Amino acid sequence: MVCGGAGFIGSHLVERLLADGHSVEVVDDLSTGSLANLGDARAMGGQLRFHHLDVTSLEFAELVGLRRPDVLYHFALLAPQASDNSSVMRAVPMLLSVLEAARNHGVKKVVVCIAAGLIYGEVHAKHLPVKEGRKNDAIGVPHVMAQTLIDLLGVYREKHGIEYTVLATTNVYGLRQRE
C-alpha cells in the first residue's frame, strides 16, 4: 500500500512494485498528487487499485484492515519545500493515523520519505559524508517536525513492533516533478 502514490516519488515506487509483480493499493487525496502520474503504472497492466482517500480518514483505517499489507509506504509527508506551518503541522496526525492503522491491522513495516535537509539541516561539504545519527543543526518548525516524525516511528517500533525505514532524500528530480 502506497500512501501518496499519485505523487512524484510515490508514483515511481508504484511502477517499481508493479514491475516486481506486487499488487499495489494507492491511497492519495490528490491534494498535491495527480492521477496523470499513475498513467504509466496503469498501462503496465498489473494489479493496481486507486483509493481517493485522506490517510486520516476512517475509510483509510478500514482499507488497511481489509487489505492488511505487509508494508505500508507513507510518502504523503513533508515535502522538501514545506515551509508553511499548517502543512508541516498536518504531518504528525497523518503519520499517527498511518501508524495506528498499521498497529491495529498487523502491518509489519512502515516506510516514510522525508527530505534529508529537514532531518539533518544544511550540511557543508567538509562534513560529508553525513553520518546517521548526526544532530540536526537546523532550527525551524519543519526541522523539529521531521525529528518528531522519526521519534514517533521509534516509539511504535519499541511499543508495537512495527519496523520502519526513513528514506532521507536529497535533490530528487525527474519525470512527473512539479515545477
Predicted stretch roles:
Residues M1-L175:
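N-terminal Rossmann-like NAD(P)+-binding domain of SDR-like oxidoreductases, especially those catalyzing
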Residues E179:
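ATP-dependent carboxylate-amine ligase catalytic core
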